[in-house]
């Protein structure tokens, strides 16, 4: 007679399920982070050839890190948000880009390396602050200015200069 294994592996959940219905997570935080990292680089590698597939993969990473996972995993969400913003900009989906931008700004508390967060914001402002879409540009500049706690002095000044240039060009 075959001895019954008290654990049954369920492929779809990546969990070990005990015979009593309880479960044991197979992924540790490190394994989860490694999985997110692999997914991120897979999505990034297909971005040039298939924007729609890359959008799906980056969105999947973002959604996987929605809950209360460790802060180290939040970095992959942050990186995915930046990539999603780039794709939506390419596709001229400015409303979607703004939703992602707001979500990215709200990650300020979760990114341990504040220099990384702030330097990313500088690059984002440089990239999208040159848009020819005045409606988008105004919203884009105003959003972080409405939350000055996200900004250091350099970013605050950079955004205000962008705002002045925008207003000057508007007249």
Regions found by a protein language model. Give the residues of each.
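Extended alpha-helical scaffold regions
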Residues: 1-171
């Amino acid at each position: 007679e075959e001895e019954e294994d008290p654990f049954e592996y369920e492929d779809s959940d990546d969990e070990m399920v005990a015979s009593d219905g309880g479960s044991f997570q197979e992924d540790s935080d490190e394994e989860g982070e490694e999985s997110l990292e692999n997914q991120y680089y897979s999505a990034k590698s297909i971005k040039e050839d298939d924007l729609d597939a890359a959008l799906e993969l980056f969105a999947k990473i973002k959604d996987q890190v929605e809950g209360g996972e460790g802060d180290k995993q939040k970095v992959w969400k942050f990186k995915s948000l930046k990539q999603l913003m780039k794709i939506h900009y390419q596709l001229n989906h400015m409303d979607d880009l703004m939703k992602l931008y707001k979500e990215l700004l709200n990650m300020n508390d979760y990114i341990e390396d504040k220099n990384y967060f702030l330097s990313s914001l500088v690059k984002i402002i440089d990239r999208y602050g040159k848009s020819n879409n005045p409606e988008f540009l105004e919203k884009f500049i105003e959003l972080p200015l409405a939350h000055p706690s996200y900004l250091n002095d350099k970013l605050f000044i950079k955004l205000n200069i962008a705002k002045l240039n925008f207003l000057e060009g508007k007249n």
